[in-house]
Amino acid sequence: MNKSYKKWDVVLVNLDPTKGSEIAKTRPCLIVSPNALNAALHNLIIIPFTSTNKAYPTRLTTNYKNKPGALAFDQIKTIDKSRVINKDGELDKNLRDAANITLQIMFSEK
């Protein structure tokens, strides 16, 4: 585990095995954990991308690598770094701002 991961990196992650309604398969995921935690821990906090863009308030529409889809904030999870297959890119600045707003809305007390 010598790889370093940063907030806003997009990584390809094997999310299997899963249970119930957890999002499955190997798919791109956005790292949202702070860099200090990414460096210190064996875990990452990620948000999976999905090609199914449902009209949920917890979905952020994307066009990552020219593939329409969404970030599934309702599926945010902590994973062990051993689930990461490779780094796939970074989220662009406009989507970072939108992702921060969505995270704030999800975890605010209002």
Give the location of each predicted region:
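Conserved functional hotspots at enzyme active or ligand-binding sites that engage polyanionic ligands
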Residues: 1-110
